[in-house]
From Swiss-Prot:
One of its GO terms (cellular component) is cytoplasm. It is found in: Cytoplasm; Secreted. This is Leukocyte cell-derived chemotaxin-2. One of its GO terms (biological process) is chemotaxis. It holds the Pfam family Peptidase_M23. Residues 1-18 form the signal peptide. Induction: By phytohemagglutinin (PHA). The gene is LECT2. Has a neutrophil chemotactic activity. Also a positive regulator of chondrocyte proliferation. Does not show metalloendopeptidase activity. It comes from Homo sapiens.
Length: 151
């Protein structure tokens, strides 16, 4: 009886720690956060030149398929920059109590339903704009809170 309860509890804890979102990038077994490089660090609130980082950077190879983290609606395009550089693209997704902005992807669509784990788009070539940076998807909650626990 005790071992059954222990196994059940261990399963619940590992599920909770894994977060409710799907893996973001094809070819990755988990949502690994970008470490530090000369362009900064990928964790939430990492200091940037003028402000703290408002999202989390998930490692992903350029050209890789990017997946929806949860079931919801793609509600529009998001652009992280004021210019028209090669990586200035992304989407906003809302649903299941979540709202996120995902940057540096070429989405398959800018509006409409999407399911958790469904192809959302393709990672853009960050190296063209930031040589030496670790390629990644930027994901941030719409309310600027820390998304790390859901990853």
């Amino acid at each position: 009886m005790f071992s059954t309860k222990a196994l059940l509890l261990a399963g619940l804890i590992s599920t909770a720690l894994a977060g409710p979102w799907a893996n973001i990038c094809a070819g990755k077994s988990s949502n690994e956060i970008r470490t530090c490089d000369r362009h900064g660090c990928g964790q939430y609130s990492a200091q940037r030149s003028q402000r703290p980082h408002q999202g989390v950077d998930i490692l992903c190879s350029a050209g890789s398929t990017v997946y929806a983290p949860f079931t919801g609606m793609i509600v529009g395009q998001e652009k992280p920059y004021q210019n028209k550089n090669a990586i200035n693209n992304g989407v906003r997704i809302s649903g299941r109590g979540f709202c996120v902005k995902m940057f540096y992807i070429k989405p398959i669509k800018y509006k409409g339903p999407i399911k958790k784990g469904e192809k959302l788009g393709t990672l853009l070539p960050l190296q063209k704009v930031y040589p030496g940076i670790q390629s990644h998807v930027h994901i941030e909650n719409c309310d600027s809170s820390d998304p790390t626990a859901y990853l």
